[in-house]
Amino acid sequence: MSHNDTIVAQATPPGRGGVGILRISGLKARDVAQEVLGKLPKPRYADYLPFKDVDGSALDQGIALWFPGPNSFTGEDVLELQGHGGPVILDLLLKRILTLPGVRIARPGEFSERAFLNDKLDLAQAEAIADLIDASSEQAARSALNSLQGAFSARVNHLVEALTHLRIYVEAAIDFPDEEIDFLSDGKIEAQLNGVIADLDAVRTEARQGSLLREGMKVVIAGRPNAGKSSLLNALAGREAAIVTDIAGTTRDVLREHIHIDGMPLHIIDTAGLRDASDEVERIGIERAWQEIEQADRVLFMVDGTTTDAVDPADIWPDFIARLPKNLPITVVRNKADITGETLGISEVNGHSLVRLSARTGEGVDVLRNHLKQSMGFDTNMEGGFLARRRHLQALAEAAEHLEQGKAQLLGAWAGELLAEELRLAQQSLSEITGEFTSDDLLGRIFSSFCIGK
């Protein structure tokens, strides 16, 4: 599909509504206005008039907005038709527009993609549009808006600019080796490099917070049957999301709940009780439980406190611990403290966190909530933050690695050429965030996840 085509799509959600909006962008948008409206509206003024069919009869009436390029969202000529939000009406109007030559249905995210290609947005800002639409909390929405307004891009561009100046200095030292002053060893380059590394570390810290806001934390509740896993899911969710009985093996499939702890999304997964099962349905549920455990950010190892006094997970169930993926964080949750009389709270046992609570009464659950928030390093007091994606974290990590490699070359061998190459690679990694250096495949993956009308 060509970017020279004129595209059209519904910009409002499908289904019935008070208002339905069709968006048209491209060279033929002017022709669409002439054919459907009978005239070209005054730029950036709301015009109330009928929307006409091929034979001149009215299909609907509403507001038309005309944004001639380059002063539009996409940078192209853009026409918006705001009519009644009935699916039949919008479908008739869409079919009418598609009868015109050179007009086609937009691909998902194509309006935002054209805005990016026409330098109306950088890539991080374009992604922020989708993140703002998908925001699951007020804090996530505010951070996504900050990204859309350029907060994240400004931080990245500052780093790129600092690297550009540093590269100029290093290249000069390489090109003029006969100067009386040895620029590579006089300490100035090292000082500037340390400054860039410190600034990058600060951006990475904020980006990790932004990623938590966007992606959340996947927590799997696992343990033996009847340990209270479903009761804990209900306590964390604040509602009866799972069936709770005294019958072992009640939960046979994976149950998912999405909650927020002070703005941080938490994806809680309740799993079937782990045991050697002869029942085929239960056996499948247990296999699914292990699949979820292997993909978790943290596992809550649920223990029935009435069955054992052990607190070390290796003593409680060594086979379970042995099967866990290496380096997967676990929190031991000793349940039924209301029966055992154990002191509620959190402690450390052989490097593992141990929480004592009662899922049935809810006592101690707030301690667990706070522990989950702290274990992910989530800071609820960070103001003016931005949202970040996993690809952003990866790009920042790659840039940091190149800078550390460059510093090692500088201090170890005064190797200016190798330092210059590491600085170039770091700059390239950062530029991938804003799209100044990005492959077509990556662009395709990013924009294909957008809404059709975006």
From Swiss-Prot:
It comes from the Bacteria. InterPro entries: G_TrmE, GTP-bd, GTP-bd_TrmE_N, GTPase_MnmE, MnmE_dom2, MnmE_helical, P-loop_NTPase, Small_GTP-bd. Its cofactor is K(+). Mg(2+) binds at S230, T251. Its main location: cytoplasm. Residues 216-377 form the TrmE-type G domain. The keyword Magnesium applies. (6S)-5-formyl-5,6,7,8-tetrahydrofolate binds at R23, E80, K120, K454. This is tRNA modification GTPase MnmE.
